[in-house]
């Protein structure tokens, strides 16, 4: 049971962070389908930071440097979406799909180049970060507490305050609802949309780091992030683009994802003799069912996915 709770919380943390990132982007009016690719690049930045930053670095400094690296890499990668969708009015869904493909491919190429430079016989896409990973973890009895679990709670609260209680958040939401009206009162729609995309990249990149620290002490980047970017989109829609609802939805999806990892520890589930692949499919099946039922009632930002034309009224 302890393991189920532990995995549920860490997977929910990943989904909540990435879904919050998507929420900021879509509230600004830009659909971010590329969360999967952003997660991979953020994970790459964090993994390389854990690999190359000296182990003698003080724990809190190491923690901050690793997090900042993931956040910055995610933000830089998200600029591809920002420039293409905001500046050149490209189709946002196509750009996001391209980012997903490019993220994993670029990560594999970079990691293999580094590994070959260190050892010509090592052509794997694996980064090992065994020692540095411990800076995120605290043992509480049998429970392995990850500091990101606390960070996510703070992120949910901060997101709610920023989006609905600050001038910046209200302006951001205005650009996703009626950009022409926002522009008419002096709000720079382009700047707000870039801000939304950059925040999305920061949270998506951080989510990628949390994902790889939830597993073993190395990561093979050919595996990507197992569709968590797409699950986060389902969490965002299920949460109706609201921070607190997204946190609750992430717990639900995180539970089913965790169940696929630890179901062998529950005798009643083992007695059912269901194939392991069914448990692995559970979170994705749930996402399809949820989206099928709520798609007609979802209240997405009205101008999301629509390129802003300053001359249109």
Which stretches of residues belong to each language-model region?
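Hydrophobic core segments of alpha-helical transmembrane domains in multi-pass membrane transport
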Residues: 18-19, 43-47, 104-108, 149-161, ...
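Alpha-helical transmembrane segments within multi-pass membrane transporters and channels
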Residues: 57-106
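Helix-loop-helix "hairpin" substructures at the membrane interface of multi-pass membrane proteins
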Residues: 141-220, 244, 248
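Transmembrane helix-bundle core of multi-pass membrane transporters
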Residues: 103-165, 266-278, 303-313
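Cytosolic-side transmembrane-helix boundaries in multi-pass membrane proteins
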Residues: 159, 177-191, 263-313
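Short, non-helical or kinked segments that cap or interrupt transmembrane helices
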Residues: 24-45, 64, 86-99, 171, ...
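Transmembrane alpha-helical segments in multi-pass inner-membrane proteins
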Residues: 219-284
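Membrane-interfacial amphipathic/re-entrant helices at transmembrane-helix boundaries
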Residues: 1-19, 31, 45, 54-66
């Amino acid at each position: 049971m302890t393991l189920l709770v532990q995995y549920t919380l860490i997977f929910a943390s990943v989904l909540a962070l990435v879904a919050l990132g998507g929420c900021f982007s879509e509230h600004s009016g830009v659909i971010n389908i590329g969360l999967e690719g952003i997660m991979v690049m953020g994970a790459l930045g964090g993994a390389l930071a854990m690999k190359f930053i000296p182990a003698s670095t003080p724990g809190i400094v190491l923690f901050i440097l690793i997090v900042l690296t993931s956040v910055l890499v995610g933000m830089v990668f998200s600029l591809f979406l920002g420039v293409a969708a905001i500046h050149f009015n490209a189709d946002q869904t196509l750009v996001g799909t391209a980012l997903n493909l490019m993220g994993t491919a670029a990560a594999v190429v970079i990691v293999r180049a580094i590994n070959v430079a260190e050892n010509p016989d090592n052509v794997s896409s694996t980064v090992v970060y065994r020692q540095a990973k411990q800076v995120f973890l605290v043992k509480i009895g049998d429970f392995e507490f990850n500091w990101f679990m606390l960070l996510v709670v703070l992120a949910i609260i901060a997101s709610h305050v920023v989006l609905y209680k600050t001038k910046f958040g209200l302006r951001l939401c205005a650009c996703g609802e009626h950009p022409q009206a926002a522009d008419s009162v002096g709000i720079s729609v382009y700047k707000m949309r870039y801000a939304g995309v950059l925040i999305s990249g920061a949270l998506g990149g951080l989510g990628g780091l949390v994902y790889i620290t939830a597993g073993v002490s190395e990561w093979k980047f050919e595996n990507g992030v197992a569709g968590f970017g797409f699950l986060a989109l389902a969490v965002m829609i299920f949460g109706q683009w609201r921070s607190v609802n997204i946190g609750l939805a992430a717990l639900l999806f995180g539970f089913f994802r965790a169940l696929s990892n630890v179901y062998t520890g529950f005798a009643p589930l083992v007695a059912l003799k269901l194939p392991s692949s069914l448990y692995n499919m559970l979170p994705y099946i749930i996402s399809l069912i949820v989206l099928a039922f709520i798609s007609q009632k979802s209240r997405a930002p009205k101008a999301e996915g629509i390129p802003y034309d300053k001359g249109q009224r």
